[in-house]
């Protein structure tokens, strides 16, 4: 009480108020102001929830282009494993997704010969060291695929490599030493092929700092179209671990070969030749020169099919790929680049309503789910067909529920549900008014017109009038591949 009285007298002197008047004012104050603040009962012992902080790349629609990866190391003393900082795709952490571990980004390069350019270099390493390390990191991928990588020193390259700092033009700033090490962008994105390394990291060759080889090889995997994987010891694992020597895991290899196929074997020594002496046994093998695709303006085609909305022309083991009427870069290419184990040449091809792709050769057929083989070789007799091969296959109708097989002057209707032709006795192609009696290939366009190819010519069939349009046949080369118009054009 004595202490309170002293305090009141001090306040009274400070405010120049008589003590009785000060006591009166205190009695008139509301009781809420005189009570000590205390938390509500239901919050007193409740722990504070901490909201996790998401990386910018984890926020949907927050950036113009989502990068393929950020390598994020923790402090050396931390027990948390070092990892790539971009959130993993949901399937990567799905416990049910065990058989196929590798995850694709949804994009891939449409050619196999890629160029790269290094714009700026880290200060810790001489330029030649960086060039050798980048080449070695790319070689990890080229050794198991048909991909090749060539360094260029000016202009725009397919893969642009840069060592940069903080804000550098892609809304994904670096953060100085530690933290984010690098990021890369997938194919078919706004910044496809860009690979950025944080200039402020301690870049080294080996485990005495941040190993450039390990990080570069991982980022190049993203640039080629691979996402993260949960497979143990995979280079594309989101967790950063120094490994020596650097190599791909079986999961990495399966993923990249799913996108680009296996490497093409070429002789590395002078080509051996067979002995010219008749009857002489020899174990020398005469290796053929690498095949070259036929001249598109001068060839006929073995098969044509609309696959995933794009037009594929097949000839002698090669394929031409047209999207919106334009031949895509990197084509013609070997058909085995997309469909491993596919025989050459194919006689016919079509895509059914479920997206499965059927190929025919001789008395057998194969079925692929995208680029994954699911059936074959299987005999044509399984489909109710006997005798000689199918020459052409046509998917007709908006729902892809009408499939026709052509052979010579005959045709059959095939039912995907029963996996059989409706009648083993064929009908005559004269039912298709104006179509030649024998055809090489057939397909349907997005507007419902059917096309029949024979030799260098094609016929366009009207589904409403049920006959070939006037002014046909037309030459294939000028209309599909911008070849010069022949002098004897059919009009």
From Swiss-Prot:
A motif (Cysteine switch) lies at residues 82-89. Induction: In skin fibroblasts of superficial dermis upon skin lesion with highest level between days 5-10. PROSITE patterns: HEMOPEXIN, HEMOPEXIN_2, ZINC_PROTEASE. Disulfide bonds join 297-483. Hemopexin repeats lie at residues 298-342, 343-385, 387-435, 436-483. Its cofactor is Ca(2+); Zn(2+). Binds 1 Ca(2+) ion per subunit. Binds 2 Zn(2+) ions per subunit. Ca(2+) binds at residues 175-176, 178, 180. It is an enzyme of class 3 (hydrolase). Residues 263-277 have a biased composition (Low complexity). GO terms for molecular function: metalloendopeptidase activity; metallopeptidase activity; zinc ion binding. Its EC number is 3.4.24.-. GO terms for cellular component: extracellular matrix; extracellular space. Zn(2+) 1 binds at residues 168, 170, 183, 196. Residues 260-279 are annotated as: Disordered. PANTHER family: MATRIX METALLOPROTEINASE (PTHR10201), STROMELYSIN-3 (PTHR10201:SF20). May play an important role in the progression of epithelial malignancies. This is Stromelysin-3. It comes from Rattus norvegicus. The gene is Mmp11.
């Amino acid at each position: 009480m004595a202490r309170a009285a002293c305090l009141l007298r001090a306040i009274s002197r400070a405010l120049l108020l008589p003590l009785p008047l000060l006591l009166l004012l205190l009695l008139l104050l509301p009781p809420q102001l005189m009570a000590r603040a205390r938390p509500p009962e239901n919050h007193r012992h409740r722990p504070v929830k901490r909201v996790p902080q998401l990386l910018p790349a984890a926020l949907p629609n927050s950036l113009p282009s989502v990068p393929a990866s950020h390598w994020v190391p923790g402090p050396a003393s931390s027990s948390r494993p070092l990892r790539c900082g971009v959130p993993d795709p949901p399937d990567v952490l799905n416990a049910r997704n065990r058989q196929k571990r590798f995850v694709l980004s949804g994009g891939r390069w449409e050619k196999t010969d890629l160029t790269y350019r290094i714009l700026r270099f880290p200060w810790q390493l001489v330029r030649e060291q960086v060039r050798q390390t980048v080449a070695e990191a790319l070689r990890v991928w080229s050794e198991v695929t048909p991909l090749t990588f060539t360094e260029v020193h000016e202009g725009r390259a397919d893969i642009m490599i840069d060592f940069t700092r903080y804000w550098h033009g892609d809304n994904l700033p670096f953060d100085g030493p530690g933290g984010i090490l690098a990021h890369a962008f997938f194919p078919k994105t706004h910044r496809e092929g860009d690979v950025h390394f944080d200039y402020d990291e301690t870049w080294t060759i080996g485990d005495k700092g941040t190993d450039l080889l390990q990080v570069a090889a991982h980022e190049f995997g993203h640039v080629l179209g691979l996402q993260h994987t949960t497979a143990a010891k995979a280079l594309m694992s989101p967790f950063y671990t120094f490994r020596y020597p650097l190599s791909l895991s079986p999961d990495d290899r399966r993923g990249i070969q799913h996108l680009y196929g296996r490497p093409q074997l070429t002789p590395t020594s002078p080509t051996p030749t067979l002995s010219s002496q008749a009857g002489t046994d020899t174990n020398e093998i005469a290796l053929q020169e690498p095949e070259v695709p036929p001249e598109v303006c001068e060839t006929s085609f073995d098969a044509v099919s609309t696959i995933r909305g794009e037009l594929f022309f097949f000839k002698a083991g090669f394929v031409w790929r047209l999207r919106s009427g334009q031949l895509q870069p990197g084509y013609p290419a070997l058909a085995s680049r997309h469909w491993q184990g596919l025989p050459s040449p194919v006689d016919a091809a079509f895509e059914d309503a479920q997206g499965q792709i059927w190929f025919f050769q001789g008395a057998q057929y194969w079925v692929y789910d995208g680029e994954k083989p699911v059936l074959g070789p299987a005999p044509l007799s399984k489909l109710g067909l006997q005798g000689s091969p199918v020459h052409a296959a046509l998917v007709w109708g908006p729902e892809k529920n009408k499939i026709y097989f052509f052979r010579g002057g005959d045709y059959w209707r095939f039912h995907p549900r029963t996996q059989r032709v409706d009648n083993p006795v064929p009908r005559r192609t004269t039912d298709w008014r104006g179509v030649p009696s024998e055809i090489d290939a057939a397909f349907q366009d997005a507007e419902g017109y059917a096309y029949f190819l024979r030799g260098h010519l094609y016929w366009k069939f009207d589904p409403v009038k049920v006959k070939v349009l006037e002014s046909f046949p037309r030459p294939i080369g000028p209309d599909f591949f911008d070849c010069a118009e022949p002098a004897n054009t059919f009009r």
